[in-house]
Amino acid sequence: MKRRELIRLLVGAAAGAWAFPASTQQRPRIGILHSGFPKRTAIHLLFEALGKLGYGDTDIDLLSGEGDPVRLKSLVNQFGARRPVVIIAITTPAAIALKEATLKIPVVFAFVSDPVGLGIVESFAHPSGDFTGVAYSEAGIGGKWLELLVDAIAGMTRVAVLWSASKASIARLESIRTSAATRGIEIFSRKLSGLEDLASAFDDAARAKAQAAIFMTDNTMFGHRKLVAELALTHSLPTIHSFRLEVQDGSLMSYGPTDDEILRRVAALADKILRGARPSELPVEYPTKFELIINLKTAKALGLTIPESFLLRADQVIE
């Protein structure tokens, strides 16, 4: 079965519980571009959201870059030939690749941390051009990560921040520094040059006597989240991350937007475009729903006792 046919069936299955308005118009074609390996649960959430909006019998092309920039560029060119009515770009590299291609096709992006700084849109209120979407989070989330570590780990005075170079990461690092200054927390900052730099970054954090770490995940590191969790455990370093999956794969905790809210809002923006709106007329949105996930098994492996009052704040505790 061809991938497009399979995706159409999945959309229909996800939307099967709802009735869709009859239409004699030609089915619109929707493109979905992911730079890496899309999470099955996330894709299902997106299909479900599109199904609820009436796109249960729509041609959908789901293309995955599988972490290969050359492949990603080739897939963008395929969209140029197929000419979908709208493309949903999942992850920053996917959005950038589409921006650089100048296809003149409306794009709705998801999980992009700094769309203005990256030049994808001119501003949040007035995106301009063919792009709009849902940004991942504001810079202030960095301060929230530090706050959660302070509340979870008694007597903590030194925190490592492991980050990949991007304007979004730099803004979050400044938010962390500001929060740390008010709490008397010392920050050890370590920029990651790439996957080959990961182990040495944890070594440096341990030598700096960090008692915990904030790990700013990029697309490459997210694909190696189990390795990140293993390195953190090896170095006895509690870590906080952005994504639920990082905690499910062994890291201590995460705080970030929920996939379902982001993807529902992305689907809603795509629906508006399919109904005639221009991306430039649709302000870029921020998520409003965040979740705290804690891996208690990892806490025990680290010899860490999480206060009961903190556990009660969690949206999910993995035993």
Predicted regions and their residues:
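Short hydrophobic alpha-helices and adjacent helix-cap/hinge residues
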Residues: M1-E319
